[in-house]
């Protein structure tokens, strides 16, 4: 086995890209297996910062493939823009591979996403990038795949078949303008021409690599608590960020996976609507938001802030089979006198240790916290676990104990050199 999954284990924005990039230095391929350009990751390449949402994190690491799997929905315009940005810094992208089975985000997906979000009072806070409508078409079997995009004749046939129905939705349901066939065809055929050199059967490619003992990292987008099945439905994404999403979204089998690394922050954050049991609305939240620069990479919206939630994290451990834990942003908590971790909930007088499926439960939910002492020492320069203040060490140990998952790494800053391993993920 030589496959490792790195998955966000909260509501996204946990710093997965940094961890993936960190492990990618010793990998032969990095694979995105779900989501689209609705979730960004910030990655440092030397002293240059990249904010990517379409390209896999591994694109910046020389020596391994960066793979967009079949479970991803691809926005060709956004992808080509990021390719141009990376190339402008002198970084080659010959290592990019795109699944011919991945679905394409079309202009009508974006238009319908914007129209639907603007027309309802029950908004779930989408990024309006067409992700949900693209996945809807995939499940409805009226989607256009990358294999279709790179074949002008097939693309023309499908666009002629699907566009009238999409235009009827836009004009009749939402009072929006219809989209022009010729404009879409000419633009997207050119996108297909530019992307064609990178398109291949990535499932076959990855199967061959793993069979030959190559090291492959699978990179989840968003987080487990945004999973369409296991997250805070309906305030979720439209795909499966859980480890199980790798099987469908990359086309590999469970026996090919060695470890599942769950990435979390030392606290909790969330963008958009939806339940958030440990959310704070005080000076502590403001402090964490400013010190941690808690604003969405894609949306730029201020993130909601809360204490660490061990109940939600145990749910993440269960549904993704986490074997290792990477804890980021420990430095953000420096200076807080006390820290809290949610260990259980109380609902209608009964203590519960599982994460509720129904969002109506959260209206009457009380959170039970465990309080730990904080630390004042500056930890940004530490080089090992033993150099951390005792209270910081105890905080990390307590998280590991509550989740029954071994600690793989901790981070005291955003840069790669500020992440410290306690063991080798590839052992």
Curated annotation (Swiss-Prot):
One GO molecular-function entry: adenylosuccinate synthase activity
Residues involved in Mg(2+) binding: 13, 40
Binding-site positions, IMP: 13-16, 38-41, 127, 141, 222, 237, 301
Binding site for substrate: 297-303
Pathway in which this enzyme or protein is active: Purine metabolism; AMP biosynthesis via de novo pathway; AMP from IMP: step 1/2
Names of required cofactors: Mg(2+)
Catalyzed reactions per annotation: IMP + L-aspartate + GTP = N(6)-(1,2-dicarboxyethyl)-AMP + GDP + phosphate + 2 H(+)
Binding site for GTP: 12-18, 40-42, 303, 329-331, 411-413
Keywords, in A-Z order: Cytoplasm, GTP-binding, Ligase, Magnesium, Metal-binding, Nucleotide-binding, Purine biosynthesis
Cofactor: record remark: Binds 1 Mg(2+) ion per subunit.
Summary of the function given for this chain in its UniProt record: Plays an important role in the de novo pathway of purine nucleotide biosynthesis. Catalyzes the first committed step in the biosynthesis of AMP from IMP.
Family stated for the protein in its record: Belongs to the adenylosuccinate synthetase family.
Protein name per UniProt: Adenylosuccinate synthetase
Organism in which the protein naturally occurs: Leuconostoc citreum (strain KM20)
The organism's taxonomic lineage, starting at the top: Bacteria, Bacillati, Bacillota, Bacilli, Lactobacillales
